[in-house]
Swiss-Prot record:
Protein name per the record: Kinesin-like protein KIN-12G
Cross-referenced InterPro entries: KIF15/KIN-12 (IPR044986), Kinesin_motor_CS (IPR019821), Kinesin_motor_dom (IPR001752), Kinesin_motor_dom_sf (IPR036961), P-loop_NTPase (IPR027417)
Keyword ATP-binding found: yes
One biological process term in Gene Ontology: microtubule-based movement
Family, per entry: Belongs to the TRAFAC class myosin-kinesin ATPase superfamily. Kinesin family. KIN-12 subfamily.
Positions of the Kinesin motor domain: 32-369
One Pfam family hit: Kinesin
Keyword rRNA processing: no
Gene name per UniProt: KIN12G
Species per Swiss-Prot/TrEMBL record: Oryza sativa subsp. japonica (Rice)
Alphabetized SUPFAM superfamilies for the sequence: P-loop containing nucleoside triphosphate hydrolases
Molecular functions per Gene Ontology: ATP binding; microtubule binding; microtubule motor activity
Coiled coil residues, start to end: 613-668, 817-854, 1029-1060, 1084-1120
Sequence positions that bind ATP: 113-120
Length: 1266
């Protein structure tokens, strides 16, 4: 299929030539997210708007370039061009996903892209016909379920012994306007999403149906798809207005080696609604609301992916899954426990360049998501492994007990040796293993064991502490997540309050709502908002931070406590060592006094051996089971290998067939270029008609030549049959002749009875030959040229046969029209020669009949001669002249022998000519076969030419009907859409007038409101500042008054002090010891009062200055009294603007009513027109499909006609080679054809037979006339 290409001076790319998708089997081992880009073909609407201009260029099967300014190159896991079929895409993306589900991984696949980019076609496709093999447009979801249940069936067959059981449950939901709807139960609406530890994220009360095969799953899919919200927009006639999620829960249970396994996985197939722009889609009313919700959820999806990338880079800690129902439901698929495939659908058209770039960027971000996929499997009842573990533990306990006992014995013996008791020394000499050196070594080993035990205890405690800390952190994190969700909910509530407030203000502005009701609702909303803020305050982020710090401090305290406890643990460890030493001494003493320790040791060894044997037996059983499982796996692998090899062979054959078909299609396209383009269709039709006429003319001519050749071949076949009969007659004649010779020899020895019979036969032959010769005008003594030429031709016939075979094998020249004319002339000549040959054959048959007649007459005459001879002999017996008669009889016998010799020579020549004639018959057989083949091919060509002509006429008639249907369609379309266009134009005109007035009024209103708010703010600021200034003035005045009072009091005190000092100075100084301290205290008091007075004066001065400044400010504020006037004027202007807006709204309402009435009047007639228009569209589509089918049939017939023409040319070349090779090339001989040779041979045969007959007749006459 040729690729569409378009050139663009501004970066328009061209269509790629097509890249083969390659599956990587090891991809899912290292990755959990796969991103696939799928490019859809250009639509007819895009071609009509932008032509073949493209905005993307594919570089390989993993890279694509956006050809805008500047160019951007993107690399993904797979890039599928517009030529990739649904089957190929499923093999590289759908099959691995099913395999992951069967292995126990959660899997998810969703399609992303703008509206009309092919998401629903990719995910669902044509689901009306189910999962039939011939349905090439079947999407991912049906193919996934078909492959899934095939895998389940194979797993059941392979693992029959494990009692494998599968259970599949399907559910189908859609998210429409942020509400979850159950597509399998339309009565269930507005379902809720729940999350718990057991089920994870799930939808409450969602319908689940258990399915057992692909047909039942498809039935659920079709039933749910029929309930899905779909509407038409400017960009897509069947645009999905919701997100759909088809979920399949797969559970499997089996038993293996005493273990009950339970594996489960979840498969999500998501079809997202397309992002769209209001300008491009023309969404209004309900469609606009749907588009808003769709874009909101898709933007949340992009935000979630961005935050996931940030989390993987340790730059963020929060992912807003709960901001939309879609992301909350797909929480596990995005950054969770799942293997996810994202198929980003894009349009290559230049008119969708911005949307395509946005989709490519989204897919590039999605490549960096990191999921943590694990196998969901549980196991229970592992009895055998538990028994093995028990045996291991028993053996380990026995070994440790033995070590402990030996250490205790050594410690006891060592202590006894130190005490130097005689019994102990004697026992040590007998054992020879409890020396002081060995004691030190075992003591060191014991310390090592103790240290290892202590370390194990410590690790166990640390693990328990960490586990508790993690559990506490998890609980805190869950609480924090709950708090964060509540915060988000409160913020949304506040946002909703604000939106409602804005709407009410708009209603108050437009006069639809009174001020009192507005204030009441405002008060209620404010109360609710205050409650929400209080709740938010209770869940303050600072509280969260403090809680986390509290946990951190608790962890630090635990670590410190661990360090403190280690000292106590060391003390306890020392105590345990001391106790162990004492225990060892006691055991050593007990061991020394036991009578038969060896028997106990042997019994202990026997028990340990029995336990070890039991352990070995269990281990052997385990090994046998493992070997059996490995054998099963090996057989399964071998079967899989054989299946893969068979599949590879099948694919190789399919590839070869595809290549062959591709080459044939290219050859046909080079010979007959019948393009579907309507602009070039008339020229292509003219060329095709000319070619068909030329082929028909050539075929007719060849047919005439073939008919001539076929007639000649039939005549040759009849001649060959007659020649065969003649040869048989000749053989019978030769046998009769030989029998006559044998009888003659016998009679020569014993008498003369056979002579009359031989003479009769000769007479019959000579009469037959003579008659034949006379009939052909040939005298007995004449020898025609053919008698001398034919022997040479007999030798050259073998050379001619070899030339024929060489010509059939080596002749490679093309058969031209001139050669066809020459062959036709040669065939005409051979036909004439064949007629001559048939005449000769009829003459030969007449001669044979005459020969038979004369043969019977001769036999009768010989009978009478016999009787005469008997009478003569009887007379001669009695006569004395016996000797003379005997002499005459001997001379007659010698003459008869000579005649027989000549007849034998003639018959031998006849036999040779018959052999040559048989070669000619074989040649005629070859000619007949070649001509028959040519006749069949000619008849087939004529039949195909007639069919081709008939199909061409049908296609022309269909095209005429198509043009008529298109004209009627255009007429109905113009008639149907003209009222819409008129209403639309009227709407645009009135909307422009009213809209401009409304926009100007609204802009002016906003400006006035801003000025009014600014002036009101200034007024409030001035009033607040004035109030503060007056308050400060009052405070300063009161302060000044207080300072003046204090100053007066200080003045009075100062005067009193001066008076006292003056009085003291006037007192008698007779008592100086008492007056000095009093004077000093008064003076210091006076100084202090003076200082305080100075301070008061400075403070008073400062307060007065501040008072002057405040008074100046108050005076300056009093100058802004004109603000109230400005505010009043602006309020009046705002009221005028509101009235203007109301007028514009009324005009808009009147305009809408007018348009509605006009539309209702026009809509009455549009229903009938719509039915006619749809019927006309259906007819046009039907005619186009028929024309396409006719064109395909014409192409197929043209290819068949070319093949038959080539075969016919080859057959004609073979026939021409036969004719040319049989024509002699010797210039000395006459240019004779094969029929001439046969004629000459027959003439020679007739001559020889005539001569033989003549000889026999002469002999007979001599005998009859003695």
């Amino acid at each position: 299929m040729p690729s569409d290409c378009g050139d663009d001076d501004h970066g328009g790319g061209s269509a790629p030539a097509g890249f083969e998708l390659q599956e990587d089997p090891s991809f899912w081992k290292d990755n959990n997210v796969q991103v696939v880009i799928r490019v859809r073909p250009l639509s007819s609407g895009e071609i009509s708007v932008q032509g073949q201009k493209r905005c993307v260029r594919q570089d390989s099967c993993q890279s694509i370039t956006w050809t805008g300014h500047p160019e951007s190159r993107f690399k993904f896991d797979l890039v599928a061009d517009e030529y990739v079929t649904q089957e190929n895409l499923f093999k590289v993306a759908g099959v691995p996903m099913v395999d992951n589900c069967m292995a126990g991984y959660n899997s998810c696949m969703f399609a992303y892209g703008q509206t009309g980019s092919g998401k629903t076609h990719t995910m669902l496709g044509d689901i009306e016909n189910g999962t039939r093999r011939n349905n090439v447009n079947c999407g991912m979801t049906p193919r996934v379920f078909e492959h899934l249940f095939l895998r389940i069936q194979k797993e059941k067959e392979i693992r029959k012994e494990e009692k494998l059981r599968f259970t599949c449950k399907c559910s189908f939901l859609e998210i429409y306007n942020e509400q979850i709807l159950d597509l399998l139960n339309p009565n269930s609406v507005n379902l809720q999403i729940r999350e718990d530890a057991k089920k994870g994220v799930h939808v409450e009360n969602l319908t689940e149906h258990e399915v057992s095969n692909a047909r039942e799953a498809m039935q659920q899919l079709v039933e749910g798809a029929a309930n899905r919200k779909v509407a038409a927009t400017n960009m897509n006639r069947a645009s999905s207005r919701s997100h759909s999620v088809f979920t399949c829960l797969i559970e499997s249970k089996w038993e293996s080696q005493g273990i009950n396994h339970h594996r489960f996985s979840r498969l999500n197939l998501v079809d997202l609604a397309g992002s769209e722009r209001q300008k491009s889609s023309g969404a209004e009313g309900e469609r606009l609301k749907e588009a808003t919700n769709i874009n909101k959820s898709l933007s949340t999806l992009g935000l979630v992916i961005t935050n996931l990338i940030a989390v993987s880079n340790k730059k963020s800690h929060h992912v807003p899954y709960r901001d939309s129902k879609l992301t909350f439901l797909l929480q596990d698929s995005l950054g969770g426990n799942s293997k996810t495939t994202i198929i980003a659908n894009i349009s290559p058209s230049s008119c969708c360049a911005a949307e395509t770039l946005s989709t490519l960027k989204f897919a590039q971000r999605a490549k960096y998501i990191r999921n943590n996929a694990i196998i969901n499997e549980d196991a229970s009842g592992d009895v055998l492994s538990m028994r093995l573990q028990i045996q291991h533990l028993k053996k380990e306990v026995s070994r440790l007990q033995g070590l402990v006992n030996s250490d205790k014995a050594e410690c006891t013996s060592s202590s006894g040796f130190i005490c130097e008791s005689p019994s102990t020394l004697k026992w040590n000499q007998g054992q020879g293993s409890f020396s002081p050196l060995m004691f030190d070594k075992r003591a060191m080993q014991r310390k090592d064991y103790d240290a290892a035990l202590v370390a194990a205890f410590r690790r166990e405690q640390e693990t328990e502490a960490k586990l508790k800390a993690m559990i506490a952190a998890k609980l805190v994190a869950e609480q924090l997540a709950t708090q964060r969700a509540e915060e988000v909910r409160s913020f949304k509530m506040r946002l909703r309050f604000r939106e409602d407030r804005i709407k009410r203000l708009e209603q108050v502005t437009s006069g639809k709502l009174s001020a009192e009701s507005h204030l009441l609702q405002e008060n209620e909303d404010l109360v609710k908002e205050v409650d929400a803020l209080r709740g938010l305050l209770d869940r303050n982020p600072e509280v969260t931070r403090f809680a986390m710090e509290n946990l951190q401090l608790k962890e630090d305290i635990r670590r410190l406590q661990t360090f403190v406890d280690e000292g106590e643990r060391e003390m306890m460890h020392e105590q345990i060592i001391v106790l162990q030493d004492k225990l060892l001494e006691a055991l050593d003493w007990k061991l020394m006094h036991e009578k038969d320790p060896i028997n106990k040791d042997l019994s202990f060894l026997g028990e340990s051996a029995d336990e070890e044997m039991e352990f070995i037996r269990l281990q052997a059983i385990q090994n046998e089971r493992e070997i059996e499982s490995l054998r099963k796996n090996l057989s399964f692998c071998l079967e899989s290998k054989e299946k893969l090899e068979r599949r590879v062979d099948e694919l190789t054959l399919e590839l070869e067939a595809a290549k062959k078909y591709h080459e044939e299609s290219e050859a046909v396209e080079l010979q007959v270029q019948t393009e579907v383009d309507l602009h070039d269709l008339p020229d292509a039709q003219t060329e095709l008609k000319t070619l068909v006429d030329a082929i028909a003319t050539a075929s007719q001519r060849e047919a005439e030549a073939h008919e001539t050749a076929i007639g000649l071949a039939k005549a040759n076949e009849e001649l060959r049959t007659r020649l065969t009969v003649l040869i048989e007659d000749n053989k019978r004649l030769v046998e009769l002749y030989e029998h006559a010779i044998a009888n003659g020899e016998v009679n020569q020895d014993g008498g003369h009875p056979a002579i009359p019979q031989i003479e009769g036969v000769n007479e019959q032959q000579s009469s037959h030959s003579y008659g034949g010769a006379a009939a052909n005008g040939v005298l007995p003594d004449d020898k025609p040229e053919s008698a001398t030429i034919l022997p040479a031709d007999n030798s050259s016939s073998e050379v001619s046969d070899s030339k024929i075979m060489d010509g059939q094998c080596n002749h490679k020249d093309n058969f031209s029209r001139s050669e066809l004319t020459d062959l036709q002339l040669q065939l005409d000549e051979m036909h004439e020669e064949n007629d001559k040959l048939m005449g000769l054959y009829e003459k030969a048959m007449q001669e044979r009949d005459e020969f038979k007649r004369k043969f019977f007459e001769g036999s009768n005459s010989l009978t009478t001669v016999d009787t005469q001879y008997e009478d003569v002999e009887m007379r001669d017996a009695t006569d004395d002249e016996d000797l003379e008669v005997k002499h005459v009889h001997d001379s007659a016998i010698s003459t008869f022998k000579e005649i027989l010799r000549l007849v034998r020579v003639k018959l031998k020549n006849v036999h040779d000519k018959l052999v040559t004639t048989q070669d000619a018959v074989e040649y005629f057989k070859l000619l007949e076969m070649a001509s028959t083949k040519a006749e069949e091919l000619s008849a087939s060509i004529q039949h195909h030419c007639l069919e081709l002509k008939h199909d061409q006429e049908d296609m022309n008639a269909l095209k005429a009907e198509l043009s008529q249907s298109q004209e009627s369609k255009e007429a109905l379309e113009s008639k149907y859409f003209s009222p819409v266009a008129s209403c639309w134009n009227l709407d645009l005109k009135t909307k422009a007038l009213v809209g401009s007035k409304f926009d100007v009024s609204l802009e002016l209103l906003n400006q006035k409101k801003e000025q009014l708010s600014h002036l009101q703010t200034l007024k409030k600021e001035f009033s607040v500042a004035s109030t503060k200034a007056r308050e400060s003035e009052t405070a300063l005045r009161s302060k000044i008054d207080g300072l003046k009072v204090k100053l007066r009091s200080f003045e009075a005190q100062r005067k009193e002090a001066e008076r006292v000092l003056f009085a003291i100075d006037n007192i008698d100084t007779s008592t100086p010891t008492l007056s000095k301290p009093v004077n000093f205290g008064k003076a210091s008091e006076l100084l202090r009062s003076e200082e305080e007075r100075t301070k008061l004066l400075s403070e008073l001065k400062k307060s007065r200055e501040q008072l002057i400044m405040v008074q100046k400010e108050i005076k300056s504020m009093n100058r802004h009294d004109d603000i109230d006037c400005k505010i009043a004027s602006l309020e009046s202007e705002v009221e005028n603007c509101c009235l203007t807006l109301l007028e514009a709204d009324v005009e808009k309402f009147v305009r809408d009513n007018t348009l509605t009435e006009i539309w209702k009047e026009e809509q009455k007639d549009m229903d009938c027109l719509l039915v006619d228009y749809q019927e006309c569209v259906f007819k046009v589509n039907l005619k186009e499909e028929k024309i396409r089918a006719c064109e395909e049939s014409l192409q197929h017939q043209t290819r068949s006609l070319d093949d038959m023409n080539s075969k016919l040319n080859q057959a004609m070349r073979d026939l021409g080679e036969h004719l040319r090779d049989r024509t002699p090339c010797d210039l000395d001989a006459s240019m004779l054809h094969v029929s001439d040779k046969v004629k000459g041979d027959l003439d020679a045969m007739a001559l020889h037979v005539a001569e033989a007959v003549q000889l026999l007749l002469v002999q007979g006459e001599n005998q009859t006339n003695p």
